[in-house]
Regions:
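Residue-level signature of outer-membrane beta-barrel architecture
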Residues: 68-70, 111-113, 157-159, 199
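Cleavable N-terminal export/targeting peptides
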Residues: 1-33
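Short loop/turn motifs that connect adjacent beta-strands in outer-membrane beta-barrel proteins
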Residues: 22-37, 71-83, 97, 114-121, ...
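Membrane-embedded beta-strand positions in outer-membrane beta-barrel channels/transporters
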Residues: 63-67, 106-108, 152-154, 194
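Transmembrane beta-barrel strands of outer-membrane/channel proteins
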Residues: 38-48, 85-91, 124-130, 169-173
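Outer-membrane beta-barrel "beta-signal"
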Residues: 64-66, 188-201
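Sequence/structural signature of outer-membrane beta-barrel proteins
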Residues: 47-51, 73, 90-96, 130-138, ...
Length: 201
């Protein structure tokens, strides 16, 4: 968790430091603080089990995400930015672990920190959702049932290629649990890098 917090601080520093201001955005482009309203993103991550994992886990995290801009903070401080509400479809092959795959949905909010004239936009996000895993409760440490809840948290930096396209890199945390509906409930905590690309319109 300390590593995750440190990553958030680093990403905020990178995006707000003058040394990382990037190429100035021309007047013809859409304002960074008032971007186009809708956005679709494809993102991939590679997650590792941590924090009392019941077994050694390595998971490929694939996300198809729709976002809509919702609220802008007009401020001269480093908090200047805008919100996005998002819905993500999740597909995760489990390369190492007791189970084989996970499918789910996640709903949440993302906040983007922006500076005038910068193409770099630090962000952080969090959401809740539900999904299904091919559980194996007969195996010690296996998930107790197919239905699970999920929690996602992420922090990273987007780079604005043009008025429509952005690429991003960041860190992702995922928690899977059935909320105590089975006993035992060997939940999963997963951390790892994430990259993606998005299109705004």
């Amino acid at each position: 968790m300390k590593i995750f917090r440190s990553a958030i601080v680093l990403f905020i520093f990178v995006g707000t430091s003058p040394a990382f201001a990037g190429t100035e955005i021309t007047a013809q482009n859409v304002s960074v603080l008032n971007p186009q309203r809708f956005e679709f993103a494809v993102e991939s991550g590679y997650l590792f089990g941590a924090i009392n994992a019941p077994a050694s886990y390595e998971i490929g995290a694939e996300f198809l995400t729709a976002r809509v801009r919702w609220g802008v903070m007009q401020d001269d401080s480093w908090l200047r930015g805008y919100n996005q509400f998002y819905v993500s479809a999740i597909a995760e092959p489990i390369f190492r672990g007791i189970e084989n795959h996970y499918f789910g949905l996640n709903l949440g909010m993302r906040y983007n920190l922006v500076r005038p004239g910068s193409r770099f936009v630090p962000y952080f996000s969090g959401g809740l959702g539900l999904g299904w895993i091919d559980s194996h409760p007969e195996i010690p440490g296996g998930q107790g049932q197919d239905f699970t809840f999920n929690i996602l948290s992420a922090a990273g930096v987007s780079y604005r290629v043009d008025e429509h396209w952005k690429i991003n890199v960041g860190a992702l945390y995922q928690h899977l649990s059935n909320g105590g509906q089975t006993n035992p409930n060997p939940s999963l905590n997963l951390f790892g890098p994430q990259v993606g690309a998005s299109y705004s319109f």
